[in-house]
């Protein structure tokens, strides 16, 4: 079907992963806003109208205070995926830092494209959580959350990585923790969750083959508190258990190879 607007098709001759493709997308995007919609998700017919309408309600003189607008997601069984805000019945106007402190899960995000000019997702694995991209850029900006579901996510789609049983993307997980779970967000965790977060960080770092000294320097939480180094053996035991159970997939190795060898093509329609 021929669209009534320009389409840019970006293709790779091998699997290259979401961060690399997202970076290519942002390099070629030329609209006022960016919105992400993965291949196993779909926007409802009025989604764009609702999001743009929400943005247009912000006075022009205050646009620079906001990163954009957000809305809720559910799966195809009606189960809310934007955890923490599923019962919210009104529009919420808050800071991105506060929103993400209370928000776990997925949401529909429409952001100002000018905010991500020359910004890049970390290319360290086939997958890295989007929060490690959002947090450094958006934390001090405001966002408006619409209480409507505008996107349906298919969690049963072939190849879905949302709930895989393998230990994959470990390097990406380690980097994501080091960027996202700092300062304000880490301080809000209770003691048990803090200990579990640090233990898993060591686990992911080991499985992702991030060197010991580098993993310390990457995350301010462990570099500033040497006591967290005592949890390194616990992370090592979990990593060893994962290996013995045959759960570990070294996706970062495949990514490193693909990132050096891939050929990208960009076609304008």
What are these regions (language model features)?
Residues 38-42:
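The conserved acidic donor/metal-binding loop of glycosyltransferases
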Residues 1-11, 56:
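Acidic donor-binding segment of Leloir-type glycosyltransferases
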Residues 12-29:
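Glycine-rich, basic loop-to-helix element that forms the pyrophosphate-binding segment
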Residues 34:
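Short aromatic/hydrophobic "clamp" motif used to bind/position activated sugar donors
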Residues 46-83:
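Conserved donor NDP-sugar-binding/catalytic core segment of glycosyltransferases
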Residues 147-269:
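C-terminal subregions of glycosyltransferases and related glycan-biosynthesis enzymes
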Residues 82-164:
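Conserved nucleotide-sugar donor-binding catalytic segment
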């Amino acid at each position: 079907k021929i669209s009534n607007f320009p389409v840019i098709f970006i293709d790779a001759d091998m699997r290259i992963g979401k961060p690399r493709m997202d970076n290519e997308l942002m390099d070629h995007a030329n609209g006022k806003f960016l919105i992400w919609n993965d291949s196993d998700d779909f926007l409802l017919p009025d989604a764009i109208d609702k999001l743009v309408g929400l943005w247009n309600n912000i006075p022009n003189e205050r646009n620079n205070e906001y990163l954009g607008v957000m809305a809720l997601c559910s799966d195809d069984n009606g189960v809310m995926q934007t955890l923490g805000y599923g019962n919210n019945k009104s529009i919420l106007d808050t800071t991105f830092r506060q929103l993400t402190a209370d928000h776990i899960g997925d949401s529909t995000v429409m952001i100002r494209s000018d905010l991500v000019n020359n910004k890049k997702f970390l290319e360290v694995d086939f997958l890295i959580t989007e929060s490690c991209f959002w947090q450094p850029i958006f934390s001090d900006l405001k966002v408006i959350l619409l209480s409507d579901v505008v996107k349906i996510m298919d969690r049963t789609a072939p190849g879905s990585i949302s709930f895989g049983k393998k230990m994959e993307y470990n390097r990406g997980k380690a980097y994501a923790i080091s960027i996202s779970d700092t300062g304000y967000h880490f301080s809000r965790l209770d003691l048990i969750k803090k200990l579990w977060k640090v233990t898993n960080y060591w686990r992911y770092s080991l499985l992702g083959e991030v060197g010991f000294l580098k993993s310390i320097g990457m995350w301010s939480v462990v570099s500033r508190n040497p006591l967290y180094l005592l949890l390194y053996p616990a992370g090592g035991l979990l990593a060893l258990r994962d290996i013995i159970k045959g759960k570990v997939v070294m996706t970062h190795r495949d990514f490193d190879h693909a990132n050096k060898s891939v050929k990208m093509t960009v076609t304008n329609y």
